[in-house]
């Protein structure tokens, strides 16, 4: 049975889920979303059945301190604290979008925790101009335009074919969220502006697989290529998918597991 637990550090709650599977640890650091990914932990279990044959999955929600100017350093400190409290000695790290950014920082701040790393739809260098989509979402969340934000989020993240096939899910999804969640969402987005750790990761020596999409409207193909070049690691670029290819591409989980087993 899946578990959801909380670790407290200072004024922040670090929420995480455990999806029991194999003996090895697989830490999932998700991308941004208006509501908690842990609301969908049962769906994650279904989607990642192939991974669960060999790994137990630990899904971390992003710790949410209430201060308006919190940073990536704080997010990393909370994550390291939680991993050590849980007692995970070494894990495969799987980071999506902002979760990939956090994973990359972890790779040079606490490399001993990481056995292998999969970086998905992410970036090691950003600026406000490069993140026009996120800037729009920040403005929507600041205005508490929950329905508009959710609709734009869904239609930006996924291909038009996926959206049309899942219209019923979209109609259920667009009303989810609260004013407080909008404020947290906006704070997380702001941490992603003017981010640059390309030089920091050049000396990282952890087996890494970077996966991106040529049609990613948030980071673009180039961001994945920059990470792979800095790390000197394996790279795969999907064609025909948007940012959330990790939910759409039918071979995605198999591709990850095959890489993990070959490294």
Task: For each feature predicted by the language model, list its residue ranges.
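Conserved alpha/beta-hydrolase catalytic His-Asp/Glu region
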Residues: 128-131, 147-200
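Conserved alpha/beta-hydrolase "acid-adjacent" motif
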Residues: 217-223
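Catalytic histidine-centered segment of alpha/beta-hydrolase-like enzymes
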Residues: 241-253
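Flexible "cap/lid" loop of the alpha/beta hydrolase fold
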Residues: 108, 115-144
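Conserved HGGG/HGGXW glycine-rich cap/lid loop of the alpha/beta-hydrolase fold
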Residues: 8-66
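Gly/Ala-rich beta-loop-alpha elbow adjacent to hydrolase catalytic centers
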Residues: 95-99, 103
């Amino acid at each position: 049975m899946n578990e959801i637990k909380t670790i407290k550090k200072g004024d922040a709650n670090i929420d995480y889920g455990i999806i029991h599977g194999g003996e090895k640890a697989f830490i999932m650091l998700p991308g941004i979303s208006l509501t908690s990914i842990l609301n969908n932990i049962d769906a994650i279990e279904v989607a990642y059945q192939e991974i669960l044959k060999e790994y137990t999955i630990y899904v971390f929600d992003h710790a949410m301190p209430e201060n308006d100017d919190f940073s990536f350093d704080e997010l990393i400190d909370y994550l390291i604290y939680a991993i050590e409290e849980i007692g995970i000695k070494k894990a495969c790290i799987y980071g999506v979008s902002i979760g990939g950014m956090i994973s990359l920082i972890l790779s040079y701040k606490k490399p001993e925790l990481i056995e292998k790393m999969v970086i998905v739809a992410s970036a090691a260098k950003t600026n406000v101009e490069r993140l026009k989509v996120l800037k729009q979402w920040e403005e929507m969340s600041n205005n508490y335009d929950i329905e508009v934000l959710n609709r734009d989020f869904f239609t930006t993240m996924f291909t038009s074919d996926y959206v049309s096939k899942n219209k019923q899910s979209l109609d259920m999804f667009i009303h989810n969220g609260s004013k407080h969640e909008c404020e947290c969402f906006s704070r997380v987005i702001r941490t992603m502006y003017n981010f640059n750790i390309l030089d920091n990761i050049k000396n990282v020596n952890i087996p890494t697989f970077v996966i991106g999409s040529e049609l990613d409207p948030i980071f673009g193909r180039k961001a994945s290529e920059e990470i792979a070049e800095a790390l000197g690691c394996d790279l795969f670029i999907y064609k025909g998918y948007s940012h959330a290819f990790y939910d759409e591409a039918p071979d995605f989980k198999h591709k990850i597991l095959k890489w993990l087993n070959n490294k």
